[in-house]
């Protein structure tokens, strides 16, 4: 065999990858018979809207190293690829295309819009899988799955009905995170926070005359209770004032009432452990309809939930007509003016505030009461916690177990419905339902649905449970935890044995990589310039015990030089063996 003098990565890698594909050895069914004991990795399915970024490249390289090592060791290896339908992300992408045409999804209607998304998916949905092939990934492409293919959809429907028949899925009204632009509910894990300069407004709530039995001798009764808030517009929905039970300043006021400014509704003063005595004056407004912590307080004190902000972030409900229909920021200005006019604004203070943003469109999130579908989480969380604590599933590095345990310990029922058009329709909601299922509901079934569940298949018998999950820290709760309890609930065993949490790839300066911020690095450019092997080597070379990576292209250059050395060494050996009497082995 003659090896060219110059190493041309593109020519060599394309030729060798095509030989691998032709051999069929990425498919475990076509491996030699000596490969009996299975070894399985399921690729975390990238969004159909996605293109390869450095995080994908690192994760795919880690998985490929593991799968190739086990294949060489004689294991029956399955590395199963696929993509996620990515409900909100995909819908936002198509809506942007429609906007360029001067249209909205409402102009098309639900069914035509879904047809448009399917057409887009067929055209662009496999781009990232093609890029993974360019990276050299040895997945079994014949088993590629999509989270909305026919068999996968059957699994999602079966899982929903299973939970529903157990009484674990219910429909109810609760405050939820809501995106006014996407017009859908979001989980806490689907929100990004942006710190901004804001204000704290100190508002006087007139005290209802205190009953004589609670007055302390020699103490002058207060006229007002001063409350600090960063969102005065929500005060129209207040149903209580809360203080910490250990706060001596307000001990004699617990159980009394104040008059809600501008509304003139009597609301009680309650004691609750959630109140931070160091925030503002130590007395806080309780607005159960528009704050998730306030909702928790309301459950303990049997407080009403009043809706004063609607799905379009406008004021609504039984409030003075001068505020109704105003956007929240406009209402805030008007309310502050009126409080000043009535002498009920004590002071204003500069304050840094974390603003919740939609993770897809970055619109400011509103918490609003809404009818949604929920999955009870208490029993599922207990199952998952027990299994992880038993040591039957191991996290690497181990410190990431704490993220999982903290979430499971403080678990809340999961809002599984979304008010979008692209996704799995809720099985019992009837034709053309208003809601679809949260994308993570279907993603939670990935280890079992891809192997054939709810049917008993050869793949599920041979390859479940899988061996390794390699993923990122930011989806431990969104995805990893949910796959764990889904595997236990539906298959009776854990879906994987080891969880590798990869480091985050940062810029050389330590900043987050982002194409939109101009700090992203395109792995495809590196592959084109240096080759896939050099890119893989350069990325993996920087991994150090789970610590985040400050990426530098110098390591890819080093990888290229290493590939050259291997090439030249191989060429030298081949030249020498050609001169000798040693026969090459095929």
Model-derived regions: residue spans:
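N-terminal, positively charged nucleic-acid-binding surface of large information/translation enzymes
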Residues: 1-210, 219-246, 287-300, 304-319, ...
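Short beta-alpha connecting loops at secondary-structure transitions
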Residues: 104-115, 316-325, 519-524, 548-555
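A glycine-biased structural micro-motif
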Residues: 252-255, 321-332
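Conserved active-site neighborhood of enzyme catalytic/cofactor-binding cores
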Residues: 47-81, 96-98, 179-181, 190-206, ...
């Amino acid at each position: 065999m003659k090896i060219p003098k110059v190493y041309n990565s593109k020519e060599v890698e394309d030729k060798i990858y095509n030989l691998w594909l032709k051999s069929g050895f990425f498919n475990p069914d076509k491996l030699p018979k000596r490969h009996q004991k299975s070894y399985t990795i399921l690729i975390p399915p990238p969004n159909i809207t996605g293109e390869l970024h450095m995080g994908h490249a690192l994760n795919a390289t880690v998985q490929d190293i593991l799968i190739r090592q086990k294949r060489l060791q004689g294991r029956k290896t399955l590395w199963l690829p696929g993509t996620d339908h990515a409900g909100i992300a995909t819908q936002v992408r198509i809506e942007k295309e429609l906007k360029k045409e001067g249209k909205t999804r409402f102009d098309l209607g639900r069914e035509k819009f879904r047809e448009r998304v399917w057409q887009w998916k067929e055209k662009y949905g496999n781009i990232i899988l093609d890029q993974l092939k360019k990276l050299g990934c040895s997945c079994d492409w014949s088993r590629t799955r999509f989270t909305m293919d026919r068999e996968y959809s059957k699994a999602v429907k079966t899982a929903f009905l299973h939970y529903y028949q157990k009484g674990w899925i219910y429909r109810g009204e609760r405050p939820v995170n809501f995106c006014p632009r996407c017009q859908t509910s979001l989980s806490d894990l689907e929100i990004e926070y942006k710190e901004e300069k804001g204000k704290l407004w100190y508002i006087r709530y007139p005290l209802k005359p205190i009953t004589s039995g609670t007055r302390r001798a020699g103490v002058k009764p207060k006229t007002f209770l001063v409350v600090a808030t960063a969102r005065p517009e929500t005060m129209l929905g207040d149903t209580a004032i809360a203080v910490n039970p250990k706060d001596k300043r307000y001990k004699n006021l617990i159980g009394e009432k104040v008059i809600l400014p501008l509304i003139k509704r009597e609301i009680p003063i309650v004691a609750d452990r959630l109140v931070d005595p160091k925030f503002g004056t130590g007395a806080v407004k309780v607005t159960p309809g528009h704050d998730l912590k306030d909702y928790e307080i309301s459950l303990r004190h049997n407080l009403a939930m009043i809706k004063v902000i609607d799905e379009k972030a406008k004021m609504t409900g039984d409030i003075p007509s001068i505020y109704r229909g105003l956007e929240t920021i406009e209402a805030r200005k008007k309310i502050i003016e009126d409080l000043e006019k009535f002498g009920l604004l004590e002071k204003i203070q500069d304050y840094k505030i974390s603003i919740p943003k939609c993770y897809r469109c970055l619109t400011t999130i509103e918490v609003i009461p809404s009818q949604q579908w929920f999955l009870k989480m208490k029993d599922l969380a207990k199952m998952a916690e027990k299994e992880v604590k038993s040591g039957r599933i191991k996290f690497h590095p181990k410190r990431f177990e704490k993220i999982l345990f903290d979430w499971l310990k403080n678990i809340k029922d999961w809002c599984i419905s979304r008010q979008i058009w692209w996704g799995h329709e809720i099985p019992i909601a009837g034709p053309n339902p208003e809601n679809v299922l949260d994308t993570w509901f279907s993603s939670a079934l990935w280890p079992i649905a891809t192997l054939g569940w709810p049917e008993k298949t050869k793949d599920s018998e041979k390859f479940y449970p899988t061996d390794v999950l390699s993923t990122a820290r930011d989806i431990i709760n969104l995805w990893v935890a949910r796959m764990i309890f889904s595997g236990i609930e539906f298959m009776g065993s854990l879906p994987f044995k080891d969880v590798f949490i990869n480091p985050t790839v940062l810029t050389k300066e330590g900043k987050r990589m982002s194409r939109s911020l101009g700090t992203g690095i395109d792995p495809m450019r590196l592959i084109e310039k240096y080759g896939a092997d050099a890119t893989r080597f350069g990325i993996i070379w920087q991994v150090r015990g789970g610590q985040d990576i400050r990426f530098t292209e110098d390591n890819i250059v080093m990888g290229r030089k290493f590939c050259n050395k291997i090439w030249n060494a191989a060429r030298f050996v081949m030249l020498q063996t050609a001169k000798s009497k040693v026969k090459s082995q095929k």
